Amino acid sequence: QSDIDLLFLLPYKKTAWAEAAIENTLYFLWDLGLKVGQATRSISESLLLAEKDQTITTSMLDARHLWGNEELSKSFKKSYREKLETMSSADFIQAKLDEREERQHKAGQSRYLVEPNIKNGKGGLRDLETLSWMTNFCYKCSRPDDMFKKGILNKDESTTFLKCENFLWHVRCQLHYIAKRPEEVINFNDQREMAKRLGYDDRKGLLGVERFMRHYFLIAREVGDLTRSICSILEEQQKKSIPVISKALSYFSEEKVEGFILNAGRI
C-alpha cells in the first residue's frame, strides 16, 4: 500500500456542500482501506503556503488533475508555475539536497548495504524523485524524455533514468507483496524470494539471489551517476553557487594514493 495525497481545490471559500462532498469522498477511500493524506484549499491559499513550506512546494509540483472542474485545475497549474518563477531555484535545490543528505544519513550512507532501503537509501527511488523535482522546478520537466529534449540528460542517460526507475518500482512492488505490508528495506531473509519472483535463476557459480543483488547495486550506482550528471548541469546553469551541489559533486571525485584509489574517503 502507498499513501494517496489529495488536494481538494476550491474556487472560493469552503461551502457546506463542498465540505459534505469532500467528507463523503474521504470516507469512501478509508472504507477501501487506503491511507489518504488530504488538504482543502483555494488557489490563493495554495500559492501562499507553497511560498512558506518546501514540502508543499514539492508536493504541488507533482499535482495532476483527477476529477472535477478541469478549468480550475488548469488555472491552478498556471498560477503555480507563475509563483515558481518568483521563487529562488537555488534555495529549492539546496533544500532538496539537504533533505537527501539527511535521509541517507538515516538510511545508511553506502549504496552497497546488505539490506538496502529501496525508497530512502542511496541510489533509491527518492533520489530519482528528487532529481525530477529539481528539474521540474528549474526547467519545467520531470520525465527523462523531456530532460533529454531540454539538454539536461543525453539520450543514454535518459534511457538509464527510465530503466532505473522501472527496476526500482518493480522491486518495491514485489517487496510489498512479499511482506504483505508497506516495507522499504530489502531484508536478507526476503532477498531469495525476491530474486525468484523477478526471474533470477541460479547459474553456474552464481546463485539467483546473488545475481539479483548485483543488479540492484548496479542500478543504485547508475542512479548515483545520474545524480552527479544532473547536479553538475544545475550548478553550471544556475547563476548562484549552491554549496550542497558542490559537496555532492566532490563526493564523486577520486584521489589516487600509491596502490589505491580513495573515493569519498573510501579505499
Sequence positions of predicted segments:
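A nucleotide- and high-energy phosphate-metabolite-utilizing enzyme signature
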Residues: 1-267
